A protein has these predicted regions:
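Sec-dependent signal peptide recognition
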Residues: 2-10
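C-terminal motif of bacterial Sec signal peptides marking the signal peptidase cleavage site
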Residues: 14-16
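C-terminal cap/linker of serine protease catalytic domains
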Residues: 19-25, 86-89, 163-223
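A conserved glycine-rich beta-strand in the N-terminal activation segment of trypsin-fold
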Residues: 30-61, 67-73, 148
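Terminal peptide-recognition signature
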Residues: 56, 60, 81, 98, ...
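Mid-chain, structured segments of secreted extracytoplasmic proteins
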Residues: 66-91
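Flexible, gly/ser-rich surface segments that form the specificity/activation loops bordering the active-site cleft
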Residues: 88-147, 162-174
Length: 223
């Protein structure tokens, strides 16, 4: 697949509307997402969503700055930050094209939101300088604030985190045949890419004297 130099400019890092997700007050799927804020010097000025990764770390997007407890920012739009699990860990796995997905998170008014769609086979790149990180796509809606929240499969597994969205005008401008015909597209970082970033973090930590290697911290997975 050819690099999409225009995709970064066209994509919106969940700073605009992509269809209309619905509020989800009592849906069990919403329990996996929680709100995270920017820290100093922008304390509480910016917000996003996050999901637990293992007993000691949670994961959100890198474009949310100054997250308290952040210890590693990956090549892709992802960062790991210290956050103790307070409930059962989610199961993680790779997504499957064609399966039903639900994007979960919170909007700018702190209301729980979710948008349902179908996983597409199309993969995209957001930045030619990120080492070739590939992002998944689905046709469900997302809104500002959901960035970093989990993307769930029908079996309850987390298959990635919300990152960005593309409007119909964006899709027309990039001229991707495999994305044509959609009113909007949401972009997420798949589990496989998140796991690769975690392994890079583990390798980095293993070379720091006196710092425990986080690779031994388990994550729940059904793969």
């Amino acid at each position: 697949m050819r690099p999409l130099k225009s995709l970064l400019a066209a994509s919106v890092l969940l700073s605009g509307c992509n269809g209309m997700p619905v509020a989800s007050y009592k849906d069990p799927a919403q329990e996996q997402a929680f709100v995270v804020h920017s820290g100093c010097p922008l304390a509480l000025m910016l917000m996003g969503s996050a999901v637990q990764w293992n007993e000691d770390y949670a994961v959100t997007v890198k474009h949310l700055p100054f997250v308290s407890g952040s210890e590693y920012q990956g090549r892709g739009d992802v960062q790991f930050f210290r956050h103790k699990a307070d409930k059962a860990l989610p199961a993680w796995r790779n997504f499957r094209p064609g399966e039903s997905l639900t994007a979960v998170g919170f909007n700018a008014f702190y209301l729980p939101m979710q948008g349902q769609g179908q996983a597409l086979s199309a993969l995209v790149r957001l930045d030619a300088k990120d080492g070739g990180v590939m992002y998944g796509t689905h046709d469900g809606p997302t809104v500002v604030g959901m960035s970093g929240g989990p993307v769930l499969a029908a079996d309850g597994s987390v298959v990635g985190i919300n990152v960005a969205n593309l409007s119909r005008r964006d899709l027309e401008s990039i001229k991707r045949a495999d994305l044509s015909g959609h009113q909007q597209i949401s972009i997420f970082l798949p589990y496989l890419q998140i796991q690769r970033e975690w392994q890079r973090f583990a390798t980095q930590q293993a070379h720091l004297k006196g710092v425990p290697n986080p690779v031994h911290l388990p994550i729940a997975s059904i793969d």
